[in-house]
Amino acid sequence: MNTKETIKGKVTAVVGQIAELRFEGAEPELYWIFTTPDRSVLLQVFQSVEPKVYRCMVLKGRDVLCRGMEVTSNEERLKVKVGKNLLGRVVDIFGMPVDGGSEIVADQATEVLGDSPHYKKVRSEKKVWETGIKVIDFFSPLVWGGRIGLLGGAGVGKTVLLAEILHNVVTTHDGHSDNNRRRVSVFAGVGERVREGHDLYYELKEREVLKDVALVFGPMGENAAVRFLTAMAGVAMAERFRDWHGMDVLFLIDNVYRFAQAGSEMSTLTRTIPSEDGYQPTIGSEMANFHERIASTDRGSISSIEAIYVPSDDLLDYGVQSIYPYLDSIIALSRDVYQEGRFPSIDLLGSSSSMMTPTVIGEKHYEAITKARSVLKLSENLERMVALIGESELSPENKALYHRSKIIKNYMSQPFFVVEDQTGRPGVYVSLADTVDDVLNIVNGKFDNIPPEEFLFVGSVKNKVPAPVEATHEQITTQAVPVN
């Protein structure tokens, strides 16, 4: 029987979050974990400096770490607790509860830094996963096994939108079987505020949907290594639900940019020469390792929704650009839309999906989105004219077109369940079928006699808007704008 050798090292230097270890005998491999006998200190091997000398990230116990301290390793990497006992609980990357509850007894533990599934085992399910949020389901639908990114600067509503998606999916789908599979959700909070995690936890608990969600947090107060590994730990939990329990998993992460930022901080701490825009030279491989683990197999699926902070609203930032290649759909949150008071503040034309094909979303949905994007695109050209001479000076055809574009924009606003106590408006869930029917009615001119303001923060039009009369404007034929 193979027994793992105990590797011993001695701390020779401690600089902030970095500890240097010297070894007299056998040397460690990258990412091995070293601890003290009482496990008050936890170090992860990160970099080889010279023969027998290695730099380690201090994951735990920086206050008690000192020069001359001996640490040992059993040739193991960092593991996180996984399994059904994590559902309804909040943990850190060490599997310790941070929700004030009892200790978690997990049936298994798995390595945080795992490998992606073999490409022969990866399966692609071309099926839309409904969220009940009109603008997402219509313009950038989530597909089983797909990845969708919520891009936006500070304070435009990424976290609220992510929380609403989680609430709707859990309420509507989780805990119910589909093709003999149970659906669960995993939420990874990476580098964000503790308050946001606190609010999310109690919102889910209050609505009695926490039992189908596992949460792992590494808030901004933690060091860079812990924040970086929290994202990987979340994926490891999702993989276990997929591979061992045969579940369909919705994986949500807030925020992927903080994951990239944590990697950059780690690179700086280890004195690695940066690459473009000051980011770590390994950012490409780190993003690949993270995203390629989010996949579907014969056993189950992982679908991800990723909040992505855009620093200074610069979409060309290299940290943001490094995420793009792995996304199937992009939802762009706009500060201009936010200032206009339409929530969720999503740029309708700036959002896109590679899944927008008739074979995936259906002929009717494809027709509706093609017409809607055409109306929105053509109305952009009229906005400058309206700003100069006013809407009343437009031709009847252009006036009807501009009117319909405003209706579409207002219709895509929606009251959310997770902020009911703040807005005073009850949340609304709208099915995709209703959304498609409503948009077709709008672009076909059936609501031309109704003011656009009537469409703000409503659910389905058939329930909230008075019965339409025949349009008074001529039918407008618009040239279709290709859907990205």
What are these regions (language model features)?
Residues 157:
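Conserved glycine(s) of the Walker
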Residues 176-179, 183, 192-240, 268-284:
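Nucleotide-state-sensitive switch-loop elements of NTP-binding domains
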Residues 225-263:
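Phosphate-binding/switch loop-helix module in NTP-utilizing enzymes
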Residues 1-89, 94-98, 473-479, 484:
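N-terminal accessory targeting/assembly segments
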Residues 152-153:
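The Walker A (P-loop) glycine that initiates the GxxxxGKT/S ATP-binding motif of P-loop NTPases
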